[in-house]
Amino acid sequence: MSKTHLTEQKFSDFALHPLVVEALENKGFQYCTPIQALALPLTLSGRDVAGQAQTGTGKTLAFLASTFHYLLSHPAEEGRQTNQPRALIMAPTRELAVQIHSDAESLSQVTGLKLGLAYGGDGYDKQLKVLESGVDILIGTTGRLIDYAKQNYINLGAIQVVVLDEADRMYDLGFIKDIRWLFRRMPSVDKRLNMLFSATLSYRVRELAFEQMNNAEYVEVEPLQKTGHRIKEELFYPSNEEKMRLLQTLIEEEWPDRCIIFANTKHRCEEIWGHLAADGHRVGLLTGDVAQKKRLRILEDFTKGDLDILVATDVAARGLHIPLVTHVFNYDLPDDCEDYVHRIGRTGRAGESGHSISLACEEYALNLPAIETYTGHSIPVSKYNSDALLTDLPAPKRLARTRTGNGPRRNSAPRRSGAPRNNRKRPG
């Protein structure tokens, strides 16, 4: 983690529970990021917090440290039942819930607080078995949580801490009724610690959220700069006919160590995957049609470096912390301005630099003015030579529905020109 990403505030300087500090230091966390330095003094004093910060700035660790500290410092309610978790962390997607659970495991191991995970798609009985043994902190998506609550597999009457992560997306996806249903089954707002964290918190979201919070304090980091200053942004204007060849040429020239390509529809993602897989790239596909187990496996392979390229719809854009993503390609400019911020926020995380390349084609170029108005700046435009685009490209692969979305290992496919890697970089 780059030192420029951190403050001089140490976790050990706060009155955090010693076991929480130990768990953080075991993972190499000594100094706070700005959002952690702002939020922790408030949560440690029992204040509710709505935190806004760009992606990759440590929001997850801020609410996890607060949650574990609060539960260790405040005894469970006397007479608490096995099916009553003490803390509830809600996320908008299965992938984000799984990631939060993974981030919390090191704290769980040191503190002894038990974790539970609840999300739709699969694993119903496996998740239920963990819940039946009793958990302190339950992390999940609203649909599965309501399912378990209606069947009395969980009871929210002993909740001491509640967290909404990526709160804007929770509301945007229409989960507000689900959230309110869950809140109505918890103790009143003044009897629990409430936290909201997100990269974007509109006034509408804060107004709705504060209905469920107790005089929450609003904290923000770099509120006027919606895109990370370590991210180099670049824009091309291709024709529809040249768009795919431009993408493949840019990938060949940049040769990114790890990149995510976003498109607006699953069919477009499948098309991109087919071209890149045929060209010998190690590429994974992440859309809503991919089975849950396969989605998690693809994310794991991408995180470990077994895949170099991930082609995804916005299902993967929110909240996922995948380290060392060097490039993000917006094959389609998104219809939602906030999605642009979240997409390019996959790179340039934790103090590292990143590169975002967007293609403003004939179909989606009309989305650009709203995006630039929202971010507060124009995206630098680069030109390309149509005659220099790759032409020796194989026919795209057809997606095999019963197979994983991976191409051959990249190092088994010879580079097109055989030129040294450093000589393939574009100038500037």
Curated annotation (Swiss-Prot):
The UniProt record lists the keyword Thylakoid: no
Annotated region (Disordered), positions in chain: 394-428
Motif (DEAD box): 165-168
CDD domains, per the entry: DEADc, SF2_C_DEAD
Gene3D superfamilies reported for this sequence: P-loop containing nucleotide triphosphate hydrolases (3.40.50.300)
Binding site for ATP: 53-60
Locus of motif Q motif: 9-37
SUPFAM superfamilies: P-loop containing nucleoside triphosphate hydrolases
Molecular function terms from GO: ATP binding; ATP hydrolysis activity; RNA binding; RNA helicase activity
Enzyme class: hydrolase
Localization annotation: Cytoplasm
EC identifiers of the protein: 3.6.4.13
One Gene Ontology term from the biological process aspect of the record: RNA catabolic process
Catalytic activity as recorded in UniProt: ATP + H2O = ADP + phosphate + H(+)
Pfam families: DEAD, Helicase_C
Helicase C-terminal domain: residues covered: 245-390
Assembly with partners or alone: Component of the RNA degradosome, which is a multiprotein complex involved in RNA processing and mRNA degradation.
Family assignment from sequence similarity: Belongs to the DEAD box helicase family. RhlB subfamily.
Name of the protein this chain belongs to: ATP-dependent RNA helicase RhlB
